[in-house]
Amino acid sequence: MAEKQTAKRNRREEILQSLALMLESSDGSQRITTAKLAASVGVSEAALYRHFPSKTRMFDSLIEFIEDSLITRINLILKDEKDTTARLRLIVLLLLGFGERNPGLTRILTGHALMFEQDRLQGRINQLFERIEAQLRQVLREKRMREGEGYTTDETLLASQILAFCEGMLSRFVRSEFKYRPTDDFDARWPLIAAQLQ
């Protein structure tokens, strides 16, 4: 029984990995059908549906992976690092680095892969970015408590500016078919962001 469960879990993971790889390839710039995905995995469409009730559920699973990966790591950064600017820098690097290491998932983060899918999937991505922006806002607000002084610019505006930078770099990565990596020239770009943190 345990072997059957393990085999099923492995097949589910194989399906999700194939979907992510297809999103990374030129197929990712078009709608991915279950027929194409089944062919990529080497199974029938019926076999796909034994593991996932719908393609939407496959995207849900990938979004859950993205959420778990990013939120868990952001929480670790907040636990381990106390300096406000260092926290922000690490969170930005996390977002950009995650996108760079997972090009197919970046198509999901930018909404590109979800254009032909159910609207609620885009809603989940929107909620994820709202959570990240809320975390950034909290980091910025904690500076006042931790260091006794805040910023001259509203923390809400600063948080949205930082997140807009990240989203822009991820969109550029997808638009360029993964030619322009989000972390390219980060050490030169970060001072431009940090200069706004006054």
Swiss-Prot record:
Name used for this protein in its record: Nucleoid occlusion factor SlmA
GO molecular function: DNA binding; DNA-binding transcription factor activity; identical protein binding; protein homodimerization activity; sequence-specific DNA binding; transcription cis-regulatory region binding
Disulfide bonds: none
Note from the entry: Inhibitory activity is enhanced by sequence-specific DNA binding.
Keywords attached to this entry: Cell cycle, Cell division, Coiled coil, Cytoplasm, DNA-binding
GO annotation, cellular component aspect: bacterial nucleoid; cytoplasm
Domain HTH tetR-type, chain residue ranges per copy: 10-70
DNA-binding region: 33-52
A matching Pfam family: SlmA-like_C
GO biological process, one term: negative regulation of protein polymerization
The protein's assembly and partners: Homodimer. Interacts with FtsZ.
Broad class of the protein's primary localization: cytoplasm
Organism superkingdom: Bacteria
Entry-linked PANTHER family: HTH-TYPE TRANSCRIPTIONAL REGULATOR RUTR, NUCLEOID OCCLUSION FACTOR SLMA
Stated family: Belongs to the nucleoid occlusion factor SlmA family.
Gene name of the encoded protein: slmA
Function, in words: Required for nucleoid occlusion (NO) phenomenon, which prevents Z-ring formation and cell division over the nucleoid. Acts as a DNA-associated cell division inhibitor that binds simultaneously chromosomal DNA and FtsZ, and disrupts the assembly of FtsZ polymers. SlmA-DNA-binding sequences (SBS) are dispersed on non-Ter regions of the chromosome, preventing FtsZ polymerization at these regions.
